[in-house]
């Protein structure tokens, strides 16, 4: 599955020399163009097509030996057709001449019997992207299988070197390149090439019912932006050892502090609630809150599709619409929904350029590189006045109601006493309401851009920690 175009045809072509043995973007472009032309011949009033090629390779090791090494490669195409206000989406991996023609005919036949939807349609041509910045998403160096094995083994060795780690849960290293072309019957055309690199490690302490495990990982388009394998392994080992011999706590209402590894989930809940599809269906607890103060005035939450080397960067969306940096929360105020063309029409607004799609699905709203801006206090200062509190490092389950805003999740982490992180805690729940969570949220100054959604350490007042 793909998201949407992320660099211009020009920038994709300029990178081709480094990957000419792996990719032929001109062939993908021609394929997408044939799909659109075939749809028009079959009777579609409008159409768009995506053609995708992905190549990936991964190595998994345990106890210094390769357990699995695999490589995958594939082409997929997706076609969306419109007959009047009726829409159908089809996909296939049969990219032969007959396959393309049959796919177009099937799509048009499906659209003719689909229900009318007055909100469907291609994007307004006046909103399409014209300028395509180079976001530097393609690493020209493709690591070999032996290099991937070296990275995984180094991460595992570093974890096992941490005192207290008893065994390896496995380490892995991966690489991949994805290419995608979008063509529409209105003349929009764009493509991208994007690389991906990753290293992960899981460590274990104890055994039987006393076993604890933890992990670390790093991912980026460029290998030079990855954390070192040794750091990944060492962090996984240290986190695992710290979790040993967890205690239970009594149910109480205390400040809860979210480690950056999990604090981004709170941003994710906000973004789910401002998704245009949820707003249009009236299934979001924020449906009537646009323009209201939800957070403290020092809080800004940014969606930035144009971050250089960002994990989710792209210069136009899945409908070809121009994208831009957007402050969803500015000085604590909710400023915007995330919209594609269809949800924008339904709400009487203009798309914000947030359309995403897979080859087998129609466009729908999604986000890019999200982050909650850092505050001023250090993490230590943020917890220094907490007499009793809970520091969360892992969340379990998904007990969050997007309609009501009720929040309840399983968690593990560490107990805070007199401003210090003390012993490990497991098997608790944390509960509250997202309105109250947003209102009291206070950030530390340790923001790092490691994931698609990023936030610093966050402190929330008065959540219920359910224990014994």
Language-model-derived ranges and their functions:
Residues 1-468:
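N-terminal small-residue-enriched
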